[in-house]
UniProtKB/Swiss-Prot annotation:
Family membership noted in the UniProt record: Belongs to the drug/metabolite transporter (DMT) superfamily. Plant drug/metabolite exporter (P-DME) (TC 2.A.7.4) family.
Domain EamA: 26-152, 195-323
Protein's recorded name: WAT1-related protein At3g30340
The entry's keywords: Membrane, Repeat, Transmembrane, Transmembrane helix
Membrane topology: Multi-pass membrane protein
Keyword Transmembrane helix: yes
Length: 364
């Protein structure tokens, strides 16, 4: 009789809900940027809303089981914020502005493979190429890279001509050469953002184990992200008028993206990282593209291109070959339990008593 793994399906449901929420955030951000809102100003407001939303949860839900907050933990969270909030948003939003919502999220399908490659480098995963499992992992990773090259180098024809209003507007204002150059630059920015985001999964997975209070850690991470994003905003443009948000849709979108995107979604991902590891958590990221494509096609009237479809299909095939190998890798659970090399003063690995208490905290 097959045993029903409650914790596994709880994590699956959690990541599915997170990806729906993040896909809506992506579509909203695309619309706000197209309307002229500064990309880093939007990120700063989003993180500020998320920080204010999470403070009460961090204070009241984790006041009895919060470990000592040392200087090294704060430094680790500052670095995590740099990877997971400010820098990744900076590069991703440039790519989003220069391409489309659907295309930009097609690149997110690379996250599991890049995360797996980084996990190998940092010894969070193992790879034995002499076994079928090891070869499946390697093959899946290589197929994902090939799919990413298709996305970058081949745009193809539009598959949704009846919904071409959005791209026609850009075509009228930009020459074909300029559009091609912007699309290529956007693709490069998206690749950089994916590498940064994948690195965040590795870093945050370690932090979540030595400091398992996801509300507190996410609140601090968001606060650092506010400071970093504000500085990036001031470096790129110093006009005070860019901080004024008058449009009602933009206000509502910033509130939603802060509460859901930077608040609940990051808390949920921190919980899943601690429970299931970086590769499992990142493997659900391709779902964002599916939901975002539906929302973008319906509300933003974006084109869907042949290259995006082919590249995405190749990446997804590679992804699930990788996941098959991951699921068959019996040593994965042993690897996750190995001592962490993240040297955080006063913590080390999280005590058993702390972990058992932290499991009671809801990630909702």
């Amino acid at each position: 009789m097959v045993k029903f793994d409650t914790k596994l399906w709880k994590a699956v449901l959690m990541m599915s809900m997170i990806n729906i929420g993040l896909s809506v955030v992506n579509v909203m951000f695309k619309k706000m940027i197209d309307e002229g809102l500064n990309r880093m100003v939007a990120t700063t407001y989003r993180l500020a809303v998320g920080t204010l939303f999470l403070i009460p949860f961090a204070i009241f839900l984790e006041r009895h089981n919060r470990p000592k907050l040392t200087g090294r933990i704060l430094c680790s969270l500052f670095f995590s914020a740099l990877l997971g909030t400010s820098l990744v948003q900076y590069f991703f939003l440039i790519g989003l502005e220069y391409t489309s919502s659907t295309f930009s999220l097609a690149f997110s399908n690379m996250v599991p493979s890049v995360t797996f490659a980084l996990a190998l480098v940092f010894r969070q995963e193992t790879l034995n190429i002499k076994s079928n499992v090891g070869r499946a992992k390697l093959l899946g990773t290589m197929i994902c890279i090939c799919g990413a090259l298709v996305l970058t180098l081949y745009k193809g024809t539009a598959l949704s001509r009846e919904h071409s209003t959005h791209m026609e507007t850009h075509t009228r204002t930009d020459s074909t050469g300029a559009m091609t150059q912007k699309w290529a630059m956007g693709s490069i920015m998206l690749v950089i953002s994916i590498i940064i985001w994948s690195s965040w999964f590795i870093v945050q997975a370690k932090i979540s184990r030595v400091y398992p209070c996801q509300y507190t850690s996410t609140t601090i991470l968001s606060f650092f992200g506010v400071i970093q994003s504000a500085l990036l905003s001031l470096i790129s443009e110093r006009s005070t008028s860019m901080w004024v948000v008058k449009d009602k849709f933009q206000v509502l979108a910033l509130l939603y993206s802060g509460i859901v995107g930077s608040g609940l979604c990051y808390v949920g991902m921190s919980w899943c990282l601690r429970q299931r590891g970086a590769v499992f958590t990142s493997s659900f990221i391709p779902l964002i593209q599916v939901f975002a494509a539906i929302f973008s096609f319906s509300f933003l009237h974006e084109q869907i291109y042949c290259g995006s479809v082919i590249g995405s299909m190749v990446i997804i095939v590679g992804l699930y070959i990788l996941l098959w190998g991951k699921s068959k890798d019996k040593s994965a659970s042993v690897t996750k339990q190995e001592p962490l090399d993240l040297d955080i003063e006063g913590c080390g690995t999280a005590p058993k008593e702390l972990n058992s208490t932290a499991h009671q905290v809801s990630a909702k």
